[in-house]
Amino acid sequence: MRKLYCVLLLSAFEFTYMINFGRGQNYWEHPYQKSDVYHPINEHREHSKEYEYPLHQEHTYQQEDSGEDENTLQHAYPIDHEGAEPAPQEQNLFSSIEIVERSNYMGNPWTEYMAKYDIKEVHGSGIRVDLGEDAEVAGTQYRLPSGKCPVFGKGIIIENSNTTFLKPVATGNQDLKDGGFAFPPTNPLISPMTLDHMRDFYKNNEYVKNLDELTLCSRHAGNMNPDNDKNSNYKYPAVYDYNDKKCHILYIAAQENNGPRYCNKDESKRNSMFCFRPAKDKSFQNYTYLSKNVVDNWEKVCPRKNLENAKFGLWVDGNCEDIPHVNEFSANDLFECNKLVFELSASDQPKQYEQHLTDYEKIKEGFKNKNASMIKSAFLPTGAFKADRYKSRGKGYNWGNYNRKTQKCEIFNVKPTCLINNSSYIATTALSHPNEVEHNFPCSLYKDEIKKEIERESKRIKLNDNDDEGNKKIIAPRIFISDDIDSLKCPCDPEIVSNSTCNFFVCKCVEKRAEVTSNNEVVVKEEYKDEYADIPEHKPTYDKMKIIIASSAAVAVLATILMVYLYKRKGNAEKYDKMDEPQDYGKSNSRNDEMLDPEASFWGEEKRASHTTPVLMEKPYY
């Protein structure tokens, strides 16, 4: 038995070692490469300038009346580079002693930079209407905003009314339409509160005092307990006004209510429920809408400024290409384009309503009978009725490219994976500020990534190869655009990219191994799928480390459990008859205890609150 334990332990450690390091794999070997997957740059896989791309018409980016120079070279591929100019002079790209090979790994140098534009990941909730979470207050479930990023320039328009939504909600004998959305007056005053007042108020709170103004405003609103329910995890949203540096807590978390069945736009009917909708309006450009979940490092992980001289694109094997299928709208300026993107962005607004307007009937009845608690309970729900609690999770038309020359706003719902340097464009998102612009395009990104990849591969080659001839081998990454012509290691003359503020060069004589499909999806070409079948998708190194740690821990736990099981089995085996006659064994006395109680949940022995439908499964509508 001891020998068996030793064998199991050795097997577990060997398995862990294989997961972490592989059999005979060198430490410096690229994690996504096989040892013999490199091909010389002049092999048949890398075609010359005359190579005919068979999918020109199918995937060519179309744009009507672009207004741009017909000789402009777009970064899109496989579009023809008809207007591309040759380099000013022929370059001696390779030393006579250099052997240059091209890597087969199709990595994306923009992965880290573009992480903040993965809105589904970084925000995780609706933008136009954010009702991404549910919370209980005094025994009743309500919806509330839950986005992790600030929404710059967002406010609420009350239809046919001069009342601003930042006015305190109506209370007492006030008519319903006399109030707005903000917290009613309190003593001491908690809303609105100036930035200086908040800093002083939380000066002794180590967790809050050093936060930036937006996160501080979000946490301040989260400190208020609704309906004196200290056990509730409901948190109010807030709006921060950059103009006067004030934090407004919103008593009403609803963001949209339209239609004659649900509201009345008649200003004269003061006691009827008002209609309202979210918007990015000129009067709101200093406002920022905040949920309880705004992360304290939002400046690093969330988009704020629009990107000048840039358009969102898709990384397709070595270059950033245009997104072929977009929705195009006219827009006079960036503000209008950003507003359009916001209107089409992810929304958690209910798709259907109950036949009986329970919540709004409460409001009317509350005012009629002067029942303050009824009015409060009616205002607390966040604009959604019980019949429909749709959650977008941040999926929507959240991105746009604004063409300043044609005054067109191109809106799309696919996550961009790179930026195209184009002086005619500004890239924007539904979260971004409607006016603020970032002017610095990261021109050196390609050159820096190429240098880093070549150095990493050189270390691997130095450890694995014994080259006695003195030839220096270079493994060039699959990056075919750079502001440094020599870094491309191109087998033909690179071409100058027109309309680029970075003076980029592009190498277009190496065949692409990926393409964009009709639904804006990047896929490996059919002829290369077998070659890339076993190569995992690119993940950051910290993800790989997590996998290694998790796998090691799992193996250790399994080995421990197995040893304990075998030890107990050994003890039980001593009680068994040596002839192994099953009729003498009997049954375990604890068998009934080991059986699962069908009335118990895996959370514990108590029944769930709703035993028949513990979780509501909804069909997503994308």
Swiss-Prot record:
<feature type="glycosylation site" description="N-linked (GlcNAc...) asparagine">
    <location>
        <position position="499"/>
    </location>
</feature>
<feature type="glycosylation site" description="N-linked (GlcNAc...) asparagine">
    <location>
        <position position="422"/>
    </location>
</feature>
<keyword id="KW-1015">Disulfide bond</keyword>
<keyword id="KW-0472">Membrane</keyword>
<protein>
    <recommendedName>
        <fullName>Apical membrane antigen 1</fullName>
    </recommendedName>
</protein>
<feature type="glycosylation site" description="N-linked (GlcNAc...) asparagine">
    <location>
        <position position="162"/>
    </location>
</feature>
<feature type="region of interest" description="Disordered">
    <location>
        <begin position="577"/>
        <end position="607"/>
    </location>
</feature>
<feature type="disulfide bond">
    <location>
        <begin position="443"/>
        <end position="502"/>
    </location>
</feature>
<dbReference type="InterPro" id="IPR003298">
    <property type="entry name" value="Apmem_Ag1"/>
</dbReference>
<feature type="glycosylation site" description="N-linked (GlcNAc...) asparagine">
    <location>
        <position position="286"/>
    </location>
</feature>
<comment type="function">
    <text>Involved in parasite invasion of erythrocytes.</text>
</comment>
<dbReference type="GO" id="GO:0016020">
    <property type="term" value="C:membrane"/>
</dbReference>
<keyword id="KW-0325">Glycoprotein</keyword>
<comment type="similarity">
    <text>Belongs to the apicomplexan parasites AMA1 family.</text>
</comment>
<feature type="disulfide bond">
    <location>
        <begin position="263"/>
        <end position="275"/>
    </location>
</feature>
<feature type="disulfide bond">
    <location>
        <begin position="337"/>
        <end position="409"/>
    </location>
</feature>
<keyword id="KW-0732">Signal</keyword>
<dbReference type="InterPro" id="IPR024056">
    <property type="entry name" value="Apmem_Ag1_dom_sf"/>
</dbReference>
<feature type="topological domain" description="Extracellular">
    <location>
        <begin position="25"/>
        <end position="546"/>
    </location>
</feature>
<keyword id="KW-0461">Malaria</keyword>
<feature type="signal peptide">
    <location>
        <begin position="1"/>
        <end position="24"/>
    </location>
</feature>
<feature type="topological domain" description="Cytoplasmic">
    <location>
        <begin position="568"/>
        <end position="622"/>
    </location>
</feature>
<feature type="disulfide bond">
    <location>
        <begin position="149"/>
        <end position="302"/>
    </location>
</feature>
<keyword id="KW-1133">Transmembrane helix</keyword>
<feature type="disulfide bond">
    <location>
        <begin position="217"/>
        <end position="247"/>
    </location>
</feature>
<feature type="disulfide bond">
    <location>
        <begin position="492"/>
        <end position="509"/>
    </location>
</feature>
<feature type="transmembrane region" description="Helical">
    <location>
        <begin position="547"/>
        <end position="567"/>
    </location>
</feature>
<feature type="glycosylation site" description="N-linked (GlcNAc...) asparagine">
    <location>
        <position position="371"/>
    </location>
</feature>
<keyword id="KW-0812">Transmembrane</keyword>
<feature type="disulfide bond">
    <location>
        <begin position="490"/>
        <end position="507"/>
    </location>
</feature>
<feature type="disulfide bond">
    <location>
        <begin position="320"/>
        <end position="418"/>
    </location>
</feature>
<dbReference type="Pfam" id="PF02430">
    <property type="entry name" value="AMA-1"/>
</dbReference>
<feature type="glycosylation site" description="N-linked (GlcNAc...) asparagine">
    <location>
        <position position="421"/>
    </location>
</feature>
